[in-house]
Structures are given as C-alpha cells and as structure tokens.
Amino acid sequence: MEDSAIASTLASDTYGLDIVDTNIQDMKNNTTRFLIMSKELQQERNENLSYLTSCIFEVKSVPSALYKALGGFATNGVNLTKLESFIVDGDFNKAQFYIDLDGHAEDQSVKGALEELSFYTEKLKVLGVYPKHSYRNN
C-alpha cells in the first residue's frame, strides 16, 4: 500500500477507494470533525437550526484571567461544550484556549459573551460557525 487515508465509506464509493479496515476508532462514540476554511463568515443564521461556534483565544498573563474570561459566558447564558488549553510557543506562562460553544456568532448572547471575553484576552479569533448535529441534543 503506497498511500492511505482514514475516510468514510462514502469517500470510498465516491472515489473508488479500497477499504482496508473498518471501525478503527478506539472509543465507541468517537467522532471526527472536518473543517472548511474561509476568510469570511459563510454560515448564515437559519432560525430552524442550532449552531456551535468554535473560537481560540489567549488570556492575559494575570491572576484570575481565565476565570474572568469565562465569566462572560455564564452571565450571557452561553453554554461551553469544549475547553482545551495549549501552551504557546513552548512558553509555560502563556496559554491559548480552544472553545466550542452553543450558539451562532451572530446571536446576541454569544456576541455579548465574546465581547466580555475580549476584555481579558490578548488574542481572540472565531474559527467557525456550523450547524449542530442532532446527536449533540441528547
């Protein structure tokens, strides 16, 4: 085998690929997320859908910075579904955080939460907005 990929059976059917193995996940409900990148916001708000928004931010290096940064989500009623930390450039005094939150970046509550977040961050970037899959509603 010269080249290989982890892909869906749909990719196999579409591109005529051979399936070497199936169900290779290490956890029963494992999921893989794929991204479509764009310089402009592409996901217009549809009132009939629920959304997730993904962001990345770097807190200021001061006591309680993360606590204060996250407070805006609580006061605006925005649920965080994921929070991951990363060390920036090997500097243990700087942390960058990835978050997923319930809601669309254009929702008033999300706008308010992100505005409050920006007061306590060095950098803040909305990575994307996408429809929430129905399995997340359980």
Region locations from a protein language model:
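Domain-level signature for soluble enzymes in the chorismate/prephenate branch of the shikimate pathway
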Residues: 1-138
